[in-house]
Amino acid sequence: MNSGILQVFQRALTCPICMNYFLDPVTIDCGHSFCRPCLYLNWQDTAVLAQCSECKKTTRQRNLNTDICLKNMAFIARKASLRQFLSSEEQICGMHRETKKMFCEVDKSLLCLPCSNSQEHRNHIHCPIEWAAEERREELLKKMQSLWEKACENLRNLNMETTRTRCWKDYVSLRIEAIRAEYQKMPAFLHEEEQHHLERLRKEGEDIFQQLNESKARMEHSRELLRGMYEDLKQMCHKADVELLQAFGDILHRYESLLLQVSEPVNPELSAGPITGLLDSLSGFRVDFTLQPERANSHIFLCGDLRSMNVGCDPQDDPDITGKSECFLVWGAQAFTSGKYYWEVHMGDSWNWAFGVCNNYWKEKRQNDKIDGEEGLFLLGCVKEDTHCSLFTTSPLVVQYVPRPTSTVGLFLDCEGRTVSFVDVDQSSLIYTIPNCSFSPPLRPIFCCSHF
């Protein structure tokens, strides 16, 4: 081939970022092509818009498909480079005068075909160099994809841990104030219990704050290690075929060792401290009422009155639930404009639920709106992500770092005090009190059950 044409051919198959032959090439919407790993590394810290390093155009593209044509052409170019390397005198067997085309997995050496069948190497594993090297590259690319997903997960966890660390002391202070306010409603002889409760809460808060800081530091270290290993694997893929085959085992061992070192996030949780007499103080405000039948659905099970209501949220228990995410809402038939009221709901060991009270205009919408931090919704919710369940309250949206109730949850509505309190009945403990609620009477009970 004419040398000028060869140079054009090689340039067309070269990534403009790493200046090597394409490795898992992708073409972005501006028309320029790059190695996928190079784009990943360049775009790692870009939230939404990314920029082409060639034309500087921005793109939102994230799900990129491999350019098969470019990939095959790059493979041919690497194979041509290998054949040029093997044609040198150093790669001709001195005994048999044949090209060393075989790679011995045991000795990590190049052999000609007769040598690979000799008594010395007969029991070893051999493979043709050009195909073995490309297979190893493909294996490394799969490891790199797995590593990148791990790095992205670590980054999400790091951001979450950073947010938790920044907000943790404020959350503990908020909880201390809620517990103190609850004890102020109790008899004076519980003063000593209150002091012990608050002191334990402060100590737990300080310990968890330290754990969060340590976890954040570990994740930052993991981030550097993961990125470094990703770059090492990329460089290994770009090595000449023989070098790649000889070093493959060592870098694979390093990769597997690194995965064992990646830190997992802390799931902070303050203990549920029981408050003596809490349930007795609420029982005097207990009410019975029903849900509106036309708003109920098959995932909220009613047994007479609200105090006997069960919420079922495990899709495995109901064959009628599809794989599509659905959210079911139901309202109480009664509405409240003033006074104090208390009721209980048996949640069991379920998740993906929310209940509380809402301003009446939510009912008038007559549609399944998203349950989020919108004004006029005063809810306690439980969501499951992977294997971990988290609690939250709304108005404003606050994650609650306390144990998930696994049986019955109580709600206390104080219209004049403008508060909504949630209690873990089994533990006789306060989950949280939403203060300064922007009530617009009438207020109605609301229940939500979501299935995935």
From Swiss-Prot:
Claim: Isomerase is one of the keywords in the record: no
B box-type zinc finger segments: 88-129
Record's keyword annotation contains Zinc-finger: yes
GO biological process: innate immune response; regulation of gene expression
Entry's Gene Ontology molecular function annotations: ubiquitin protein ligase activity; zinc ion binding
Binding site for Zn(2+): C93, H96, C115, H121
GO CC terms, sorted: cytoplasm
InterPro entries: B30.2/SPRY, B30.2/SPRY_sf, Butyrophylin_SPRY, ConA-like_dom_sf, SPRY_dom, TRIM/RBCC, Znf_B-box, Znf_RING
Domain named B30.2/SPRY: residues: 269-452
UniProt KW keywords: Metal-binding, Zinc, Zinc-finger
Zinc fingers (RING-type) by residue: 15-56
Similarity-based family: Belongs to the TRIM/RBCC family.
Protein name: Tripartite motif-containing protein 51
Species whose genome carries this gene: Homo sapiens
